[in-house]
A protein has these predicted regions:
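Long, contiguous bundles of hydrophobic transmembrane helices that form the permeation core
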Residues: 2-10, 29, 35, 168-307, ...
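Alpha-helical transmembrane segments of multi-pass membrane proteins
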Residues: 94-109, 132-155, 174-186, 192, ...
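N-terminal alpha-helical transmembrane segments of multi-pass membrane transport
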Residues: 1-66, 70-86, 204-217
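Juxtamembrane helix-boundary/capping and inter-helix hinge elements in multi-pass membrane proteins
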Residues: 76-77, 91-94, 127-139, 165-178, ...
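Membrane-embedded alpha-helical segments and adjacent helix-loop junctions characteristic
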Residues: 41-127, 291-383
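C-terminal transmembrane helix pair
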Residues: 188-189, 316, 345-354, 358-371, ...
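Structural signature of hydrophobic alpha-helical transmembrane segments
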Residues: 1-8, 57-61, 189-193, 326, ...
């Protein structure tokens, strides 16, 4: 049971540091790593653990996509996209809320930073929602819950950790690997249900609060917004098309021309160049080219370091703890304990969803996926759940829940800041969103809902 004690120590240190002392969570994760080194006496392996944390391709992917999101935000391309969406659906009841769901989910997928995305898109969507009758607490939660949904939508960097967890499980159990494109298709299939869930909840709240459409004076002109922003609407195509092609042709067209190894490594490298191509395209379509000179771009990134650093630090320290826990067998011990309880399929799904929800209150989702991902996949597969679906749900049950579940629900606090909403009212309203997220997670994992790509 020592392994479970180590898990308890990690959770306790992060709780005290983050909740008690109000310090950044990445500091808490690093401190937990240091405390665990002292408790377990594994100082001799510290360089190996650091090497594991720094050698993952996740770091480059995170930096590349967050850098792209900085370019999109600073050059006002995001504003153009939001204006186009508002001009199309703002005239319907609750249109500002639907715009927040769609725009925030897309931008959240690019940035991988829930709080940062809330601040970027919420500065436009939250005031628009409030002006049309959304209560402040509801506007804050729509924005925060939609932004954190980006953690489960490709190309979010959280997906890389989930793919790595599936690869680890597949190698250990003799299962054939799937292409990155195929994995992403399944992730989009899963994400579609959660986007629909949020849209339905917005519709329900609009009925309850009698929300109005946006006034004609506030609505952007369709012709003008399309004239300015039509090029920006091609960004999703540029980002998604390589993965769709990889999923469709990885086993035939690419194999015939590149060979099996060439097709395999092409699939693995898609994530590495998509962000760069999209960033170049973003710079090319900017009307005022003086805003994207090398000097201005360098300044953008310099000012955005504070946005990038915390997320990367959490992932690096999480991988370091994951490497240590792998040596200590912590995840395996947890898996053996849960297996001994002889859960039914529904029982196992409820248990894992509950565990990730509770841990998500203090442990970042990316760290959960790194440390426990392969074990969660194995436990779910043992009760009859497709391991590919289990892996595709990891960013959801870990990454999304950690962002919307208080007290670590940083997105809620960011939304409250913009909406100037009351904490008690925002917290109570947020519980509806957390509950709906939990129920839908169970429904998808149980196979009650069909998932495109499976």
């Amino acid at each position: 049971m020592e392994s479970l004690l180590y898990l308890g120590i990690m959770l306790a240190v992060i709780c005290v540091w983050f909740l008690g002392l109000k310090r950044p969570v990445y500091e808490g994760v690093l401190l937990a790593f240091i405390v665990l080194l002292a408790v377990t006496g594994t100082w001799s392996n510290v360089l190996d653990y650091i090497n594991v944390g720094l050698s993952t391709s996740l770091l480059y992917s995170m930096v590349a996509f967050v850098a792209m999101s900085i370019i999109l935000t600073k050059t006002k391309i995001v504003d153009s996209c939001i204006a186009v969406i508002l001009s199309l659906i703002g005239r319907i009841r609750g249109g500002a809320g639907y715009t927040a769901v769609i725009a925030s989910a897309f931008m959240g997928a690019l940035s991988g930073s829930g709080p940062g995305n809330v601040m970027a898109t919420g500065s436009l969507t939250i005031p628009a929602m409030k002006r049309t009758g959304f209560p402040a607490e509801l506007a804050a939660n729509i924005e925060s819950n939609s932004s954190y949904m980006g953690n489960m939508i490709p190309p979010s960097s959280n997906i890389v950790a989930a793919m790595a967890a599936f690869t680890t499980y597949a190698a250990a159990n003799g299962i054939e690997e799937v292409s990155q494109g195929k994995f992403w298709i399944v992730l989009w299939g899963v994400s579609a249900w959660f986007i629909a869930q949020r849209l339905i909840m917005v519709w329900g709240f609009c009925k309850y609060y009698k929300v109005k459409p946006m006034s004609k004076d506030e609505l952007p002109n369709i012709k003008e917004t399309l004239k300015i922003g039509w090029k920006a609407m091609f960004l999703p195509v540029i980002i998604l098309l390589p993965f769709v092609l990889d999923a469709m042709f990885a086993d035939n067209f690419f194999v015939e021309r590149l060979g099996a190894d060439g097709a395999k490594y092409l699939s693995k490298s898609v994530l590495l160049f998509v962000a760069g191509i999209s960033s170049i395209y973003s710079c090319l379509i900017v009307k005022d080219k003086s805003t994207v000179t090398p000097q201005k771009i360098a300044k953008m990134f310099a000012n955005g370091v504070k946005t990038i650093s915390p997320a990367i630090a959490v992932c690096v320290f999480g991988y370091m703890i994951g490497a240590m826990f792998s040596d200590l067998g912590v995840a395996e011990t947890l898996g053996e304990l849960m297996t001994s309880w002889s859960f039914s399929k529904l029982g196992m799904v409820l248990a894992i969803c509950a565990i990730t929800c509770v841990m998500g209150a203090v442990v970042p989702g990316s760290s959960q996926v790194v440390i426990f991902g392969p074990v969660f996949i194995s436990l779910l597969a043992n009760v009859g759940i497709d391991p590919l679906l289990a892996a595709a749900m990891l960013p959801c049950i870990c990454g999304v829940m950690c962002g919307i579940t208080p007290p670590l629900g940083l997105g809620m606090y960011a939304g409250m800041t913009i909406a100037q909403s009351d904490f008690s009212k925002t917290f109570k309203n947020n519980m509806w969103w957390v509950g709906a997220q939990f129920i839908l997670q169970v429904a998808v994992l149980m196979g009650w809902l069909p998932v495109f790509g499976m």
